[in-house]
């Protein structure tokens, strides 16, 4: 049976530089992906909340690492700034990319990174670059395909096959997510909970 998460989630802090990162006292699960791929929506679905993580219709709005505490800080959800499109200037983009890199490499309490891929477009070069970087730095990750209700089963199957062939690693799980397909959310939630212990 899937473990249920209710609304016991609190926003801790938005870190905009390395010095402002919170302590490492709890296990953390991070969510990464292109701008507007659905990271905040997935976080809200996982914790059964409509507004814990801010969802924006404008891509590239998240420019800090947002930390959410679950169950009195037994574990945390971490919403990383989207890579790709951004309204920020060049210097600001470099600053938060350096922040993301530092967080992913140096954070000792990071348990897993969930990389979100838009199933409507599949793997883009920027996704591949990010995944290559994770592999190079020995950072464990899973893939979550978002917006699966927007594509046909045939197209979805082709996207999954393409990712499996490209990654060629049986230790990397590929999950599917849609706000309209509840059993898919449950499977992602079950996988998510494996890394919170």
Curated annotation (Swiss-Prot):
In its UniProt record, a GO molecular function of this protein is: metal ion binding
Cofactor requirement: Mg(2+)
Q: Where is the EngB-type G domain?
A: 25-197
Regions annotated as coiled coil: none
Q: Quote the record's binding site residues for GTP.
A: 33-40, 60-64, 79-82, 146-149, 177-179
Q: Name one GO biological process term.
A: division septum assembly
Keywords, A to Z, come to:
Cell cycle, Cell division, GTP-binding, Magnesium, Metal-binding, Nucleotide-binding, Septation
Instruction: Return the InterPro entries for the record.
Output: G_ENGB_dom, GTP-bd, GTP-bd_ribosome_bio_YsxC, P-loop_NTPase
**Residues of the signal peptide:** none
Q: Where does Mg(2+) bind?
A: 40, 62
Disulfide bridge map? none
The family assignment reads: Belongs to the TRAFAC class TrmE-Era-EngA-EngB-Septin-like GTPase superfamily. EngB GTPase family.
Provide the function of this protein.
Necessary for normal cell division and for the maintenance of normal septation.
What name does UniProt use for this protein? Probable GTP-binding protein EngB
């Amino acid at each position: 049976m899937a473990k249920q998460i209710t609304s016991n989630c609190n926003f801790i802090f938005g870190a905009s530089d390395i010095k402002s990162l919170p302590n490492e006292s709890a296990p953390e699960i991070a969510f990464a992906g292109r701008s507007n791929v659905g990271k905040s929506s997935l976080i809200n679905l996982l914790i059964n909340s409509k507004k814990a993580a801010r969802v924006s219709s404008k891509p590239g709005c998240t420019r800090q690492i947002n930390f959410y505490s679950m169950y009195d800080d037994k574990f945390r959800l971490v919403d990383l700034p989207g890579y790709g499109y951004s309204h920020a200037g060049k210097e600001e983009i470099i600053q938060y990319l350096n922040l993301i890199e530092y967080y992913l490499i140096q954070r000792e309490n990071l348990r897993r990174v969930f990389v979100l891929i838009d199933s409507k477009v599949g793997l883009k070069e920027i996704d591949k670059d990010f995944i290559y970087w994770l592999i190079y730095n020995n950072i464990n990750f899973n893939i979550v395909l978002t917006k699966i209700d927007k594509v046909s089963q045939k197209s979805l199957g082709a996207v999954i096959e393409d990712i499996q062939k490209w990654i060629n690693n049986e230790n990397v799980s590929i999950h599917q997510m849609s706000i309209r397909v509840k059993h898919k959310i449950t499977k992602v939630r079950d996988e998510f909970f494996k890394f919170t212990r």
